[in-house]
From Swiss-Prot:
Expressed by the venom gland. This is U-reduvitoxin-Pr7a. GO terms for molecular function: calcium channel regulator activity; toxin activity. The lineage of its organism: Eukaryota, Metazoa, Ecdysozoa, Arthropoda, Hexapoda. It is found in: Secreted. Coiled coil: none annotated. Binds reversibly and blocks P/Q-type voltage-gated calcium channels (Cav). One of its GO terms (cellular component) is extracellular region. Residues 1-23 form the signal peptide.
């Protein structure tokens, strides 16, 4: 496999992990940036490039 295929495979695995962790519209571990759901953080606490709390 060349480097690009390996990179795409790793990215696909990461995206699968993130999508499987979604419950109630928010990421369970960190929470998405939102003020509408109590499981989410305020926008000021977000890491905006991923729209998630860290």
């Amino acid at each position: 496999m060349d480097f690009l295929r390996i990179l795409l495979f790793v990215l696909a695995c990461i995206m699968a992990l993130f999508t499987s962790a979604i419950a109630g519209g928010c990421i369970q571990r960190y929470g998405k940036c939102s003020t509408e759901n109590s499981n989410c953080c305020a926008p000021s606490e977000c890491y905006f490039s991923f729209n998630q709390c860290f």
